[in-house]
Amino acid sequence: MDPIDLRSDTVTKPSEGMLEAMFSAKVGDDVYHEDPSVNALQDYVADFFGAEQALYFPTGSMANQAAIKLHTQPGEQLIAHEWSHVYNYEGGGVSFNSGVSCKLLGGARGLLTADQIAPAVNPPDFYHSPLTTLVCVENTTNKGGGACYALEDLKAIGAECKTHGLKYHLDGARLWNALIAEDQDPKQYGPLFDTISVCLSKGLGAPMGTVLVGKSEVIQRAMRVRKVLGGGMRQVGYMAAAGLYGIQHQLARLGEDHKRAGELAQCLASLDYVKSVE
């Protein structure tokens, strides 16, 4: 009997339909913006989230790091939860790539609240402390065990960002799960954030890839940052086709994943060596 691997949603493999989409994909040189499958994915995701433009990246960490680079200058500071992926699981990229420090905040299950933002912003005219320029939130939260933000809470944080002149980035590696679990309208996300990264290789089952969405001016600059980080790809439409198939055909099935995870949690709850993340 084959084992069931529940270590992570990153161990997913392409379905038969996804493999067929990959093998039949039309491709070109994406560095020249001539890969029709990449272009189709980018256009679809931008429209899906109500954003102006999107850009395909090989990994989520690269997309997040590009966003941080776009929104900050060396010596500045971003605000994030102490459990955030951008701080804990991206190899120190915030400091290495952007020369930026992190103001880390607490909060239940990896979630920030709007009332935490103002006290965390350094006085802009006090040159002894780094200038605060960016807030990063994560939905769903990785170390928080899949906790989801209410859309109104994200809007409240966004309002604080506007008040203090801060950029607002969403690490949405598992945003697909939040959309299904909370029955949220994805088109409300694009106008709310300066940038959003969404991963295709977890619950959606694609082999690789993340898409960064935002305003056209930001995404145009993101192309240069992606190049600097080594993310330019050629005939990558085979992978982009897998991601587009996952969104169009497998997104709704995340609800089944959630149901099964809940059933498994109930079975494990009686074991004294298993701890709930909720």
Regions from the PLM with identified roles:
Residues 1-278:
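Conserved PLP-enzyme active-site core in the AAT-like
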